[in-house]
């Protein structure tokens, strides 16, 4: 089994981990609803993309709820 020959210093360990950080998420404000959303994605609030309705919400009837 492989065993390290020398102890890895805190500095070298942290330098190795410097590339593992997560990047910032780019969010924009939706012009119609004012909610935050990811760019180039459909708005989750009203189902619009590029100011066009692309997803319609299904309205549940009383039979489906019960």
Curated annotation (Swiss-Prot):
Keywords: Ribonucleoprotein, Ribosomal protein
GO biological process: translation
Official protein name in the record: Large ribosomal subunit protein bL32
PANTHER family: 50S RIBOSOMAL PROTEIN L32, LARGE RIBOSOMAL SUBUNIT PROTEIN BL32
Keyword Cell membrane attached: no
NCBIfam families per record: rpmF_bact (TIGR01031)
One GO MF term: structural constituent of ribosome
Top-level division of the source organism's lineage: Bacteria
Gene Ontology CC terms: large ribosomal subunit
Family to which this protein belongs: Belongs to the bacterial ribosomal protein bL32 family.
Keyword set includes NAD: no
SUPFAM superfamilies given in the database record: Zn-binding ribosomal proteins
